[in-house]
Amino acid sequence: MDSSSSSSAAGLGAVDPQLQHFIEVETQKQRFQQLVHQMTELCWEKCMDKPGPKLDSRAEACFVNCVERFIDTSQFILNRLEQTQKSKPVFSESLSD
Amino acid sequence: MEGGFGSDFGGSGSGKLDPGLIMEQVKVQIAVANAQELLQRMTDKCFRKCIGKPGGSLDNSEQPGRPGAGVRAVPGAAKSRAEPCAPPLPQKCIAMCMDRYMDAWNTVSRAYNSRLQRERANM
């Protein structure tokens, strides 16, 4: 990627490419953080019974599985939505069925 | 690296806007926001785990899952009820809960990171 060429930020005028890169990196980092917050909250409900003096191995395994299954679920939903959108678009005029 | 930035970044009026400074400030704000988010969710979860029926003070609040315990007036009596995982005072429960929540958060963060790296490797 040629960062010394004219700015790739279409319509934004002369945006500093260094700042642009910074924004992209930080945005991605934030996306990660947000998902960690969300998954921790969800998995806490599933994996934590009574908080003890330390996180026992069963609870820890549960958290790991929970993360994996959450990502699986998310991917499944995206894939299936993509498929059903091809055959029968959801977000279109013909919503009534 | 030629570029258009420099002293003309925002030069009208007093002071120039230093992109480096802006980036540092943004990083700090992001970190603060994340800490607040963590605190908010942790407080929610630990309140649910440790405070059942709220009493007149933190000491006098029941922990959930102990029906008929009533308002805790005598901590000693509660101990003799031999519940190995329920600490005598909500504060101890909350403290443990906080530590466990941090453990959970770190575990989730690691697991998610591993999964992302695995996905990238498979592309």
UniProtKB/Swiss-Prot annotation, chain A:
Subcellular location: Mitochondrion inner membrane
Modified residues (Phosphoserine): 57, 87, 94, 96
Organism superkingdom: Eukaryota
Topology with respect to the bilayer: Peripheral membrane protein
Tissue/organ expression: Highly expressed in fetal and adult brain, followed by fetal lung, liver and kidney. Also expressed in heart, placenta, lung, liver, kidney, pancreas, skeletal muscle and heart.
Keywords: Chaperone, Deafness, Disease variant, Disulfide bond, Dystonia, Membrane, Metal-binding, Mitochondrion, Mitochondrion inner membrane, Phosphoprotein, Protein transport, Translocation, Transport, Zinc
GO annotation, biological process: nervous system development; protein insertion into mitochondrial inner membrane
GO molecular function (one): metal ion binding
One cellular component term from this protein's GO annotations in UniProt: mitochondrial intermembrane space
Main location per the UniProt record: mitochondrion
Residue numbers covered by motif Twin CX3C motif: 43-66
Disulfide bonds: 43-66, 47-62
Pfam families to which the protein is assigned, alphabetical: zf-Tim10_DDP
Family according to the record: Belongs to the small Tim family.
Noted disease: Mohr-Tranebjaerg syndrome: An X-linked recessive disorder characterized by postlingual sensorineural deafness with onset in early childhood, dystonia, spasticity, dysphagia, mental deterioration, paranoia and cortical blindness.
Biological role stated in the UniProt entry: Mitochondrial intermembrane chaperone that participates in the import and insertion of some multi-pass transmembrane proteins into the mitochondrial inner membrane. Also required for the transfer of beta-barrel precursors from the TOM complex to the sorting and assembly machinery (SAM complex) of the outer membrane. Acts as a chaperone-like protein that protects the hydrophobic precursors from aggregation and guide them through the mitochondrial intermembrane space.
Domain notes: The twin CX3C motif contains 4 conserved Cys residues that form 2 disulfide bonds in the mitochondrial intermembrane space. However, during the transit of TIMM8A from cytoplasm into mitochondrion, the Cys residues probably coordinate zinc, thereby preventing folding and allowing its transfer across mitochondrial outer membrane.
Complexes and interactors: Heterohexamer; composed of 3 copies of TIMM8A and 3 copies of TIMM13, named soluble 70 kDa complex. Associates with the TIM22 complex, whose core is composed of TIMM22.
Stated name of the protein: Mitochondrial import inner membrane translocase subunit Tim8 A
Organism: Homo sapiens
